[in-house]
Design a protein with these regions (language model features):
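N-terminal signal peptide c-region/cleavage motif recognized by signal peptidases
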Residues: 5-12
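Extracytoplasmic copper-binding redox domains, predominantly the cupredoxin/blue-copper superfamily
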Residues: 14-131
Length: 137
């Protein structure tokens, strides 16, 4: 017998904003997930940078000290060039300290800081279907 393992090209071949498969923190089943640049050793990095969530999760983006210094946009960074996705449900967040996005459709949603993406201040959110209300899928 021959078994073939197929991998999704959307998740394996594309490393949106430098997020590889093993980089994604699994936060499925949580109603609210917070992403912040609050690491005292590296303020130019989001925590978690790459995360998997369930459809319908509210994502809270927190900027330290504020979005005026770290404007956040939905979009990709490739080859050192940031491209804003005007259709992204993320942002833009350019003032204040808290921004929210309700991610209801399965897919991958990359984001970045417009001032510091060259320093690695970017990430991606994978949204997966929640097949059962009890969290088992």
């Amino acid at each position: 017998m021959l078994f073939v393992v197929l991998q999704s090209a959307a998740t394996s071949a594309l490393a949106l904003n430098n997020c590889l498969d093993n980089d994604f923190a699994d936060r499925r089943g949580e109603a609210v997930v917070q992403i912040a640049n609050d690491d005292p050793t590296n303020m130019f990095r989001y925590r978690p940078r790459c995360v998997t969530i369930s459809e319908g999760t509210l994502v809270e983006f927190r900027a330290v000290p504020n979005f005026g210094m770290h404007p956040l946009f939905g979009g990709t960074v490739s080859g050192g060039v940031a491209t804003i996705d005007p259709a992204s449900p993320i942002g833009p967040f350019t003032s204040g300290t808290l921004g929210e996005a309700m991610l209801v459709a399965a897919g991958e949603y990359p984001y970045f800081c417009d001032f510091h993406f060259a320093s690695g201040m970017m990430g991606s959110i994978r949204v997966v279907p929640e097949l059962f209300a009890d969290g088992f899928d």
